Amino acid sequence: MPGVNRKEQRRLEAKAREEKAAKLKPLKAEFAAIEIDIAKLEAEKATLTQQLADPGFFQDAGDAPKAMKRFSEIETILTIRYSKWGDLSDRLEKADTT
């Protein structure tokens, strides 16, 4: 920066880094929370997939419909979470390069 001494330049650069970090912090926190949520949902989906693959599971008339309903709910939630995850990923990438 012309007209700015080295110490002032370092101070301005540090301030810019701090502002950028403050801007990214909530996005990173939301991104991490969504990743955790996705992992939990994927684990639950895997468990339900195993249960639903067992023909004996359908002998209990009460559990099978509940499991099928929950599986469908998880699929819907995961679609939304992955979309949000992708949006946040794009926003973080753009914010990190500016």
Whereabouts are the PLM-identified features?
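Charged, heptad-repeat coiled-coil alpha-helices that serve as long linker/dimerization "arms"
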Residues: M1-T98
